[in-house]
Each structure stands twice: as C-alpha cells, then as structure tokens.
Amino acid sequence: MKAKRGETITIVGFGGSITEGAKATSSDKQYGEIVAQWFRDTFDVNVNYVNSGIGSTTSLVGIHRIEEHVFAHNPDLVLVDFTTNDSAGDERYRSPYETVLRRILEDTDTAIISVVFGAVSNYSADNVANSNYRANNSLSAHLPSMLYYDVPVIDYYGSLWRYINAGVIKWTDVAGDYIHPSNTGHLMAASAINCYLSDVLANLDDIDTTVPTLPEDYFFGDDIYETATFLGGDDIVPVSNSNFTVGKVHGIKLKKGWVCTNNTGGSITFEIKAVTSLTLYLQYKEGNSVGGIYVNGKTVISNANCNNSSTGGYIWLTDQVRFDEPTDVTVTFKCNGVFGIGPIGVTYAK
C-alpha cells in the first residue's frame, strides 16, 4: 500500500455535479477532498486530489472522457459517482457504467469505490406536507456490474433514507436542494467512505493482496464503449464549415467544441474514419436555436434544441448510428441560429 509506505498518492473523483462540489461552500468541504484529507491525516503523506466531476454528465459521457480525466492522472483510487445522473430505469446506461468500472480495473494499480447518491421528488426547502419523496436512482442498473467486479459500494443515499424514514433527520438537514448534498451531506458521505477505508486498514494483514483477474466477458455482454473517446476541435478538422469556430463552450471541462455565433445559423461537416459507433453529440447553451444531425446523408436528429435555460445536454446516438464493421462516416450538423456543440463521441474497433 503506497500510502502506508509514505509515498504520494493520487485520488480522482469521477462523476457529476455532486463530485464537482455543487452546494459545498468550499473545496475542502467536498466529499472527495475530505477523503483525501483522511489519507493525509492517517498516513502523513502527500495526496493529490483531482476533481474530475462535471455537472449534468452521465457514465456515457464519462466513458468518453476517461482517458483525459482519469488515466492521465495515474490515480491510485477513483471515486466513481454516476448513479444519480444515469437516468433511473434507462437500461442503456448499464453498458457505459460497466465499462467505466472495467476500464479502471484494467489498470491493476488502481482501486475503485463506487459512491451512490440520489435525489428527491417534489422538493421543498421548507419540508411542506407531501414533499421531498425518495426518487429512484440507477442503482438497480449499476449494481450487477458492481457485484460482478466486486467493487466496494458506499450507498450514501440508501443509508440516508433509513435515517429519514426513522425520523432522525430530514432531507433538508443534509441537502442544499433536491439533489446536491450540503456541507453536512458531503461530510456524511465522506465519513462513510472513510469508515470503510479505516476498516480495510484495520484488517490489512488479513486481506489477500493478489490482484484479481478480470472476468473474460462483460456482464451485460456489450463492449462497444471500450474504445470510446471524444474528438474535439483540436482533434479533427471539418471538411466544410459555415459560421462555426473552434472554442470552449461555457468553460466546461471537456475538449473544445464548435460554436456558431451567427444569428442566421450555420453548418459544419466532418469525415471520421473507421468508427463502430457515433455515440453521441454534445450540445451546450449558446442560444435558443434548433439544430439537425445528419450521418452519411441521412437525418438522425432534426430538432436538437439548445435550450437557453439549461447548461446543456447531449444526444444519444448509439442506437441509431452503430456498425458491425469499422465504417467511415460523414457527420453534418446544421442550425438555424446561435448554437454551441461539444466534442463528438466515437468508438472504434478493438
């Protein structure tokens, strides 16, 4: 164990806005930073904590940014948080989440802890009657992968509701809104993780240190996302372009995308070689215009709406643009006004 030997360790928080620190009043109040501080206090070592949380992103986005936001930092421990943002009941998230776990475990020097958060329905800051109901998260879709790879799971959300249902606390005691923990909630989540780590440390002499062999097959049988990556404005050059320029869209932590600032709209076309799927197109708040996505001359999406009231979103294309063999694709994006698009998610043959 590197920390016990006095070596510097690196921890990556990988997830959505909770990991990013929403509703925590300072970085040292975020659950990931508190876990990092536990290592500093326990082992008196240097700890690098890398916050790779991005608000409103899912494991589908995560698997496309894993190289840049996880592996580039050579982590010793990754705290994985996507169980809130992956839509409850949407089975499409099973495969990207499994691939996140599997890709990290393939780096045999890296450990994982899956952290489970959640939200409430009918939120009320004043706890009025018939408010703050427990909402579903995607634990039921993620749990088979967690168990299959024997990943430690800290179910903060499930444990929290046992206290709420017993009348010990209210949702608003530990949350800053309908979904994000307050400083108190971040501390509780970190304390649960640190309790697990303390138990591991206390029983370290009895733990088999042999790195387990990954199962040969994926649990859900779909390895399409194993090669997932983002292609951004610095990676590919359009073959035709009208009114789009390369640029960061609202400062989000992803690669540069392309922005159209012309009120009459524009179009941009890319040729991408030998892909097995065009996984998604990211879009971000730049205006109220509508865009269309066309792949190999066929309309895939005709009404991509970049809503000015949101920070952005993404369009899932795997179901519509997926190939049995590596295929060259021509991708065109058209819009009728100001619009911003993020990097293009693709997968390649292994």
Regions found by a protein language model. Name each.
Residues A22-K23, S59-L60, D86-Y97, N122-N127, ...:
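Extracytoplasmic/secreted cell-surface and envelope-processing proteins
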Residues M1, G32-E33, S59-A72, R92-R103, ...:
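Alpha-helical scaffolding within the catalytic cores
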Residues D81, N85, L101-L139:
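Active-site segments of SGNH/GDSL-like serine hydrolases
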Residues L187-K350:
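Conserved catalytic region of serine esterases and O-acyltransferases that act on ester linkages
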